[in-house]
Amino acid sequence: MSSYVISCCSTADLTEEHFSKREISYICFHYKLNDTEYADDLGKSMPFDQFYAAMAAGASTKTSQVNADEFEAYFETFLQDGKDILHVCLSSGISGVLNSAMIAKADLEERYPERKILIVDSLGASSGYGLLMDRLADLRDEGKPLEEVYDFAMKNRLKVHHWFFSTDLTFYVRGGRISKASGAIGGLPGICPLLNMDNEGRLIPRFKIRTKKKVIKKIVDQMEENAEGGLSYSGKCYISQSACYDDARAVADLVEERFPNLNGKVEINNIGTTIGSHTGPGTVALFFWGKERVN
């Protein structure tokens, strides 16, 4: 049994089964749907299809990050068991949750001076963030010490690529994730914008693609261009989707066709309710390991 805990926020958008199997702990963000508050608990409080159907019908959503008090109570359960902690946060480019974790860390280190609490800004989101967590769990299982796993995360977090497209950027604009000008372009008939996450963990529109068929090809082209080893890529590949499984499956099929050396099949996950509050339904995101991201 490891002497430290690997932990993240629920916004890593893996399944409960995946977190449990890999022994990755998580703490939940929160969101409101039409003024009723829920935990972003991997679809347990509200099934994903119900959540996205409500959004499509016009329901309002508002998210709230984990606060310092919640982090303190969460971290303390591990410290009381004599465990050190490696916690990886949702990207500081789209959330202030890193600051909450750092406040809790400072308070707890005074009370538990013999324990280590290491915090990493993932500079990632959704299952791309989850892909990083999965690799950190591999290193822990190989017997790597806490500091070595932390160093790996800090040195390699920008090698997780995040590419995604949506048929509607309305929710991205409403949530402040992209500008109104970019959203207006994305709203033109037949246009499917292709975005990625830059080296500061921000969402950046990159291409304006006409038709969904072409954007599916283009997103896989980006994987070919940026993946570690190109078409010989032998790492894992994750996809997240918000109520558009058929589109996600089409991307996965093309990835599996063009990258025969993948480590297993493409894993398709749901975009969780925190990230989904800002994407709305209709987003497909592709995640893989590659060369370091740039602005």
What is each model feature region?
Residues 42-45, 95, 126-127:
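Alpha-helix N-cap/helix-start motif at coil-to-helix transitions, marked by capping-box chemistry
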Residues 3-5, 79:
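A general secondary-structure boundary signal
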Residues 56-92, 99, 103, 150:
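Glycine-rich phosphate- or other oxyanion-binding loops that anchor nucleotides, phosphorylated ligands
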Residues 34, 93, 201:
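Positions that flank functional sites
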Residues 5-70:
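N-terminal glycine-rich anion-binding loop in soluble enzyme alpha/beta folds
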Residues 3, 11-19, 24-30, 86, ...:
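Mixed-charge interfacial surface used for oligomerization/domain docking
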Residues 45-52, 75, 80, 107:
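A short glycine/small-residue-enriched secondary-structure motif
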